[in-house]
Design a protein with these regions (language model features):
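Structured catalytic-domain cores with a bias toward divalent-metal coordination
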Residues: 1-326
Length: 326
């Protein structure tokens, strides 16, 4: 887990993000406010780079790590330690809920993108964000997990372009390939929406929610490598791992909890006691694999109340994933 912080601290740093764009060197950058807490930033000197990069944080208001990644990146720009090769759109998503320490208001902002019609602050914010990021050719959306994560990872809509982008920014990445969302009348995550519009967009889960300096460093490195990729740098050979989904796992009974030491990418074995349910009955794993997105870990707040929903996703590690797609 990361360092402790208060909502006042987050409020202050959200305003620091905003104030950066009034303080940035106007002799080096052209700054344009596209919407509240969303800005377009371009170098004064024209470059041959035409592709626009999008950088997003706080699509979930309680996943604050991405905010500090963007602040650190802006600090490097301001100090002249990083050159901007072309135009970027950089913004914060669920700002008002972040100021309250909430994940969202009435509706998950990261399920409000696309053709879905809805009312309320979250849908209104999604419309503003979609308009602001409409010119992006590549995008990186910074997230954190609600339950412990052994490592950063990329849940991605698999296609050649998204894979090449991940390979460019982290050739040792752990990737969970996902099927494209059905957008008809439904809200979808930000990156899925952009991919469906032709943008090469990826989401990174930096790690467990909180203020973690290793995550900030990692996130900034991803952005710097993304800038280099936009300049034409070839990706390295992929040395990471694919973890395709085998399927959802439902609780064996009421009041089910996973062991306190489990989290994202924990490896479990068939027959292993992975938790308890119904007043202390042993919960035995039916299959071996790796956990993803666990919803109820003993000692942590349950992230879902409905016992009819999956309590975790079971993953495989597939060294031949790319070969099998050919």
């Amino acid at each position: 887990m990361g360092e402790a912080y208060t909502t006042e601290f987050i409020k202050d740093n959200i305003e620091n993000f905003k104030s950066f764009f009034t303080k940035l060197n106007k002799e080096r950058f052209i700054v344009k406010e596209l919407a509240p807490y969303i800005y377009e930033l371009a170098p004064i000197k024209k470059t041959s780079v035409e592709k626009v990069i999008g950088l997003m944080a706080l699509n979930h208001g309680n996943e604050v790590g991405g905010l500090f990644v963007l602040l650190e990146f802006l600090s490097l720009l301001d100090k002249g330690l990083v050159n901007l090769p072309g135009k970027i759109t950089i913004g914060l998503g669920s700002v008002e809920s972040a100021k309250l320490g909430k994940r969202f208001f009435e509706k998950d902002l990261n399920r409000c993108y696309g053709d879905v019609i809805g009312e309320g602050k979250d849908f209104q914010r999604a419309k503003v964000i979609m308009e602001a990021f409409k010119e992006c050719h590549m995008s990186l959306d910074l997230h954190q997990t609600q339950t412990p994560s052994a490592q950063p990872f990329f849940p991605m809509t698999f296609n050649t372009k998204t894979f090449e982008l991940i390979r460019a920014i982290d050739p040792q990445a752990s990737i969970i390939p996902q099927k494209p969302y059905d957008q008809k009348g439904k809200g979808v995550p930000f990156s899925h929406y952009l991919v469906n519009r032709g943008c090469t967009a990826v989401t990174v889960e930096l790690g467990t929610m909180g203020l973690d300096y290793k995550q900030i460093y990692y996130g900034v490195q991803l952005i710097l490598k993304l800038l280099n990729y936009n300049l034409g740098k070839e990706p390295e050979e992929f040395r990471g791992s694919f973890f395709p989904k085998r399927g959802p796992v439902f609780p064996p009974g009421p009041d089910a909890w996973l062991r306190s030491d489990l989290g994202n990418f924990s490896e479990i074995k068939k027959g292993e006691v992975i938790g308890d349910y119904d007043g202390g009955k042993k919960w035995m794993a039916q299959e071996s694999g790796f956990l993803a997105f666990p919803k109820a870990i003993r000692g942590l707040k349950r992230t879902q109340a409905n016992e009819n929903e999956p309590i975790y996703i079971l993953l495989d590690r597939d060294p031949d994933y790319l070969k099998n797609r050919e």
